Every structure is written in structure tokens, then in C-alpha cells.
């Protein structure tokens, strides 16, 4: 539980327990592979405040002193996604034009933030349409889509997204150049697909949540502001890659690969997109994987097998290098008058990956190996490795 007070000195309470375990506050089999198939959440609070939880509100029983809120989740839900939020909330009702039709949305915010939130959360309409374009229908319309102001930064609580970013447009630094995009709303909503609809089988596979969540940010920037801006964002994220340990490590050992799961995970997906060199196939994989494994528990190997089946190619060596080993491949290259020399070093035996380069702004696709190869280029040409 997060126990805080709002600016008016009133109770402002939430729950965020990913990593620590939901069994801290309610009885469950606390493992990523275990999910209740539905959930009744009944909370009694003083009548001068409100409780918001996952799912839809079925009943409110009010007396002069106490009020009981009865929420119900109709779909399977991760243990750590079950949450309650208690505060002096105002409710903003909205509608979202989904691929499934016009759907209701609710935003629960501290009463003194109602006006700013009403304007700020208009972005959710564009965001939802964009994410449904990439991944298919929002999985939880049956339980609703809510943004709930919380006393902590944010969390992907299913059908009740926790929001605590103070209505900022991105957070700070380089992200502020994107203007109107709130990364908490975006990233946590992305987890409704990557994390909640499809759930990692173990903490070791958490990149399936966070890498896809981060790359969703990239895709949304691309959708709203264009591809060059999304590359700029990716380049900034690359600065945070550490490569100190494998993204996916041993399972059943409480190995959470959070360190590189976000930034490197996003870059791995972008690299895969480049290797495929066909956006129709790449985005078909994203949407198809969501449909094929909807409301299921998956491991990284399930994703690799799915990609192999769709493409007819073997991408296991690609993921062995980038996901199961901490060392990225190194491309060594040099220029000498009219020659470009290039090769890979530090790669696993079966690894193979093309590289796109610009030679005087003309795109050339190379297939490096551990043996030095030569490309003849115009004298004193400008060569740029493409991102």
C-alpha cells in the first residue's frame, strides 16, 4: 500500500506490488503463471472518499458513515494487477472510437485536478486508436478502460491504469520535445496488451512486457510525429543500454531482467523490424501474436517460434544473441579510398543478420560474417550505418 495525502491533506491511497508480490495483501498463488479467472473486489471506506478498483462498478452501498464499493473483473488478471485506489475523486466520462465501436472511458482524478485532467486525457482517444491499429482491439472493453490518479508514478493495473505523472507532456529532458504525449498514459496502456493480455511466464521474460511497452512509445511517436522523430527517441533510449547481463536469464530464480528490458528490448524489436525489411510482416507479427496468444502465459521461446512460423525463417540465433546473451554483435568496418571493409566479431556461431548502410545516400544491404568482406564504393564516398 502507498499511503499519502493530497494537497488538501486528505487521504490518498493506492496499491502497487509488482515484484514484491500481491500475496503481501491478499491470498493467492503468487506466480506469474497463475491468474484468477475473475475477481470480485469489495472495499468499504469512509463515505467522504471513493474507492476505485479494477473492472466495472456493480454496486455502491452507502450509509452516512461508510460506503462499500463492489467492483468486478470479468477476465483473467495478473495477481499484481489487482489494485484499489482511495481518494477524493472526481469522475470524467469520455468515449473512445475503438475498432469495436464507440466505447466508454472513465478518468478518476483528484477533485481539484478535474479541469486539467479533462483536457490532458483527450490524448487517450488518439492513443487508443493508434495502439489498436498496431496490436488489435483493446482486450478489456468488457471490464472498461479507466485512468486513475495515484500517489505513485504509474502501473498497468488492468482496466484501471494507475497514473501519477502530474499531467505532464512526457517527463523531462529529450522527451519533452514530443510536446503533448504523456509517456505514463502511453506506456502503461501499452501493457494492457503486452503484460496483461499476453503475460510473461517468468520474471526472467519481463522484456515481453517492458521491451514491447517501450517500443510502443516509439511506434506512437512515429504514428503521430513521423519516423525521423521516432528514431531520435530510440537513439536517446540507446544511451541507457548496459549489456551487463542477459535480458532473459534463468527461470524460477527470481531473475528480473529489468535493467535492459526496456531500452534494449525496444531496440531488439526495432532491429528485428529492420532485418525483416517488411513492415507488413513486422506489424502482422505484433497483431497476430496478440490474437494467437490472447489471455495466455508465454515465454520468449513462444514468440520466437511464432516469428519463425510466420516468416518461414529461423530467428532463434538472432534471439540467442540479443536476448539470451548479454553481448551484442560488433560490426567492425573501415574505409580505404574506394573500398568498404566489414565483418562481425563477438557473435554466436549461428548468428546471421543483414546491415543496411547508406553509401552517398544510396541504401545498400550487407550480410556481414566473421570473415572480412569488401564492398567497392565511389572514391571518398560518405558511408553511414542506418538505425
Residue ranges of each PLM-predicted region?
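Amphipathic alpha-helical substructures
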Residues: 139, 258-340
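Beta-strand-rich binding/interaction modules
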Residues: 52, 315-316, 331, 335-386
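Extracytoplasmic/secreted proteins, especially bacterial periplasmic and envelope-associated proteins
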Residues: 40, 119-126, 130, 158, ...
Amino acid at each position: 500500500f502507498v499511503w499519502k495525502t493530497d494537497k488538501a491533506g486528505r487521504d490518498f491511497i493506492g496499491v502497487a506490488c509488482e515484484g514484491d508480490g500481491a500475496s503481501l495483501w491478499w491470498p493467492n498463488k503468487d506466480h506469474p503463471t497463475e491468474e484468477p479467472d475473475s475477481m470480485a473486489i469489495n472495499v468499504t471506506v469512509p463515505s467522504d472518499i471513493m474507492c476505485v478498483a479494477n473492472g466495472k462498478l456493480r454496486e455502491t452501498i452507502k450509509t452516512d458513515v461508510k460506503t462499500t464499493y463492489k467492483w468486478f473483473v470479468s477476465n483473467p488478471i495478473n495477481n499484481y494487477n489487482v489494485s484499489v485506489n482511495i481518494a477524493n475523486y472526481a469522475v470524467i466520462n469520455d468515449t473512445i472510437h475503438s475498432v469495436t465501436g464507440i466505447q466508454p472511458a472513465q478518468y478518476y482524478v483528484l477533485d481539484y485536478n478535474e479541469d486539467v485532467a479533462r483536457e490532458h486525457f483527450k490524448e487517450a482517444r488518439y492513443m487508443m486508436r493508434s495502439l489498436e491499429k498496431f496490436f488489435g482491439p483493446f482486450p478489456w472493453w468488457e471490464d472498461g478502460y479507466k485512468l486513475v490518479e495515484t500517489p505513485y508514478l504509474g502501473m498497468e493495473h488492468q482496466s484501471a491504469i494507475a497514473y501519477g505523472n502530474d499531467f505532464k507532456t512526457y517527463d523531462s529532458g529529450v522527451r519533452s520535445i514530443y510536446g503533448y504525449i504523456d509517456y505514463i498514459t502511453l506506456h502503461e496502456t501499452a501493457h494492457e496488451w503486452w503484460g496483461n493480455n499476453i503475460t510473461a511466464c517468468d520474471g526472467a521474460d519481463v522484456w515481453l512486457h517492458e521491451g514491447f511497452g517501450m517500443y510502443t512509445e516509439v511506434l506512437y511517436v512515429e504514428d503521430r510525429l513521423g519516423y525521423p522523430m521516432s528514431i531520435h527517441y530510440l537513439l536517446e533510449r540507446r544511451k541507457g543500454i548496459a549489456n551487463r547481463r542477459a535480458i532473459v536469464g534463468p527461470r524460477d530464480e527470481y531473475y528480473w531482467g529489468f535493467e535492459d528490458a526496456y531500452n534494449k528490448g525496444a531496440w531488439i524489436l526495432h532491429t528485428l523490424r529492420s532485418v525483416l525489411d517488411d513492415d507488413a510482416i513486422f506489424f502482422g507479427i505484433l497483431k497476430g501474436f496478440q490474437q494467437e496468444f490472447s489471455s495466455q502465459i508465454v515465454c520468449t521461446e513462444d514468440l520466437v517460434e511464432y516469428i519463425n512460423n510466420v516468416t518461414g525463417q529461423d530467428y532463434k540465433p538472432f534471439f540467442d544473441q540479443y536476448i539470451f546473451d548479454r553481448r551484442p554483435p560488433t560490426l567492425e568496418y573501415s574505409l580505404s579510398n574506394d573500398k568498404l571493409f566489414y565483418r562481425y566479431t563477438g557473435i554466436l556461431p549461428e548468428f546471421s543478420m543483414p546491415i543496411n548502410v547508406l553509401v552517398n545516400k544510396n541504401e545498400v544491404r550487407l550480410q556481414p560474417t566473421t570473415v572480412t568482406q569488401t564492398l567497392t564504393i565511389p572514391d571518398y564516398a560518405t558511408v553511414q550505418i542506418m538505425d
